[in-house]
């Protein structure tokens, strides 16, 4: 409800972290953006596999429509992470596993979009980009799970955890959940609009 959102926003606005002060509020953009950067690519991978198996245009076009959104979220993750890192680590960038995997993920997003623009006709473009997307899914998975298996460097562990001792404070936890829901809802809306537009373009092309 609006009251829940306004209450959460008010609490976040007033509260400061005793170590990071105001900079901790970057978390409400950084974490949802990172969540989408990874999961949008994984969704693209699933859609690409569906295209290769079932040859359904909607799956290929949904993957295509997701790519720019995922790219923007990846860039937002890297920028906000750099700003946050400058405050907490004293540097904008370090080549630790999490950051490096996101840099590679960014390259795969850019490469995917370029391939869609460069290759014709649609079927061939869908085939090539689907294979490319599946290859890049390895780095999307690394971006998500690498902190569980190897030394995470300067980057912190998972922000949200089922272990209450490792979880963030409740005053940030619930507003962060709301931010995740908001970002995810925006993605779904944009995906539906962009995919519908792509399908309409395809219909007009086939009719013409």
Name these PLM-found stretches.
Residues 148-185, 206-208:
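Membrane-interface transmembrane-helix boundary segments in multi-pass integral membrane proteins
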Residues 196-208:
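Extramembrane terminal tails and long inter-domain/linker segments of multi-pass membrane proteins
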Residues 1-13:
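Single conserved hydrophobic/aromatic residue that forms the stacking wall/gate
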Residues 72-114:
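Membrane-interface helix-loop-helix modules in multi-pass inner-membrane proteins
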Residues 21-28, 88-102, 125-128:
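Non-cytosolic membrane-interface motifs at loop->transmembrane helix junctions
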Residues 32-47, 104-116, 174-192:
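Hydrophobic cores of alpha-helical transmembrane segments in multi-pass inner/ER membrane proteins
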Residues 129-145:
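Hydrophobic alpha-helical membrane-insertion segments
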Residues 53-64, 119-126:
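Membrane-interface helix-boundary motifs at transmembrane edges
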